[in-house]
Each structure stands twice: as structure tokens, then as C-alpha cells.
Amino acid sequence: MASRRRKLRNFLNKECIWTVNPMSGDHIKVFNACTSISPVYDPELVTSYALSVPAYNVSVAILLHKVMGPCVAVGINGEMIMYVVSQCVSVRPVPGRDGMALIYFGQFLEEASGLRFPYIAPPPSREHVPDLTRQELVHTSQVVRRGDLTNCTMGLEFRNVNPFVWLGGGSVWLLFLGVDYMAFCPGVDGMPSLARVAALLTRCDHPDCVHCHGLRGHVNVFRGYCSAQSPGLSNICPCIKSCGTGNGVTRVTGNRNFLGLLFDPIVQSRVTALKITSHPTPTHVENVLTGVLDDGTLVPSSKAPWVLLRMSDYFSRLLIYECKKLKALGLRSY
């Protein structure tokens, strides 16, 4: 039982960002979180509905008992998981979005036996709430310039998400379209990251391809809830890469207007494929992407439109929580 309490506490502390439930009041605090499937924690759900949801919808009710102290009720996908006494609970609002919070749960001491919690209503519909925006990402991230790259990455260990994205130092590092070029961006839906642009250029024509479209792997944590019918699509996550992408030459299959962001206008109409090279640590566009012309000639990518960003710790954490693949890479253990 102690092991179950420890694993649940670690999951709540390390994999959840919370939205405030309207049920919250002076005597009981209620929060909801939606997070992608964990590579570490298994809540051992049993009902068909709970198992059908492609993510974890987490609800917590926090009650301050006069004798026992903070008591916490935890539910996941509609199943009650545990009633427990916590050593302490700390709630901290996060800047930017209203109604969002980080919660730290102290050691779970024992079961809160005999304590009655009120019914925890599901969160209200938040389908209108947008995911992470490009403005939020750009204004909170650090631009890593070529001359500063060695110092910024020194002593850090990295994992490749794909050839254009890395995890390291508690942050997501990614190649991203510079602010000065966004006005000329030809309608990239979502985040204009190089990972997304490359995927749009080279993806296959099968809408159910999980490599190209990332089906049932993503959530929007700002909503605090994911329905069982959610397809798990994301137009912001940089994890998605087309099924043909790897070290080597990948054929351009569509969206050729995006080539203007990558190559000199003189040659862009002749680019038929992308030569993609993985790099073990964060680097700039010229080291990972080269164009292949119709006669096999290699042409360099344009440096100016693309910057290397190190995302803030908070938004890196948020992006990892939204994606099953990023979690598997970044949260291998607690």
C-alpha cells in the first residue's frame, strides 16, 4: 500500500498541471488535470469507460481536516483511486493563463479512512480553450545563437525527439521559425516549428498513419479534460515526424509552398527531397537539413528564417505532459 501511495504521489507531482474546478470553495479545493498516458504510473483502471479514454483525466479534492490535516481524494477517468492523508499540500498559481496551478503534494502518510468527501463533479466543458500558442512559446523561450551554443549546451545530456527537437537540461530545444518571418509564413496551422514544416512536406497520404499524424497520443492540458472520443491530434507538438523521415533522403510529397522557408528562391522549385541528418545535441538548421534537387545536387538550407529555441521550464513541462511520446523520452523513471 505504501508503494501505491508513493507512485500516485509522484505521478501527481511530476505529470500534472491543474485547472481550478468551479466546485472549489473555502472548505474544499477541487482541481482537474488532463495528462497523456504515463510511461511510469499505472492506475490499474478497471471500468470500460476509464480504459476507453486515451489519456488520464485526474481529479483531486483537498480538504483540511482539524485532526488529520490535509486529506486528498484522487480520481482518474471517473474511478476513485485513493483517499489519503498528505503531509502537506502547496498550491501555486502559474502566470499567463487564468485558472491554472501547480500543486505539490507532500508525503502520503496513510489512508483517510472514515472521511467523507463530497461528490466531485466533472469539469465544465473547456473545448474552446486553446492549446499553447506560438506567442506564448516565442515570448517565454530563449533564442540560442550560434556563437552561444557551446556554452549553452555544455555539461547537459540530451535525447533526440526527432532530428529537429531535443530534450535536455529540463527543457525542450527546437528549431523554430523566426518572428521576423512569421508574417510570410504560408498558413502553418499551429506551431511553425521545423519539425512540423518538415512533417507537412514529407508526410504520407494515409490519415490514420500514427507517425505522420500522431493519432491518440496527445491532449490539451489547458482544458483539464479529454473525452473518450478524442482523436489525440496535435498541431503544436514537435514529436510528429513523417513515416519516411530518418537519417537519409526523404521525398517531398506535398505542401511545396513551405519550401520557400527552407531554400533559396532560385532553387526551391527544383527541390524534390530533403536530406535529414540527426545530431546528438541541439544545433542549427544548416547541420540537420539539406535540399536535394531533381538532378541529385545538394543545396544548403536557408539559415536566416530559423532559430534554435530553448523553451522555458514551465512550457517544456507542459509540452511533455501533453504527449505520450515525449513523456516516454523525458520521464523514464521518477
UniProtKB/Swiss-Prot annotation:
Disulfide topology: none
Keyword Phosphoprotein: no
Signal sequence annotation: none
Highest taxon of the lineage: Viruses
Keywords: Host cytoplasm, Host nucleus, Late protein, Virion, Virion tegument
Record GO cellular component, one term: host cell cytoplasm
Location in or out of the cell: Virion tegument; Host cytoplasm; Host nucleus
Keyword Nucleus: no
InterPro entries: Herpes_UL16/UL94
Subunit composition and interactions: Interacts with cytoplasmic envelopment protein 3 and with the capsid.
Known function: Plays a critical role in cytoplasmic virus egress. Participates in the final step of tegumentation and envelope acquisition within the host cytoplasm by directly interacting with the capsid. Upon virion binding to target cell, a signaling cascade is triggered to disrupt the interaction with the capsid, thereby preparing capsid uncoating.
Membership in a protein family: Belongs to the herpesviridae cytoplasmic envelopment protein 2 family.
Name by which UniProt lists this protein: Cytoplasmic envelopment protein 2
Naturally occurring in which organism (per UniProt): Human herpesvirus 8 type P (isolate GK18)
Lineage of origin: Viruses, Duplodnaviria, Heunggongvirae, Peploviricota, Herviviricetes
Gene behind the chain: ORF33
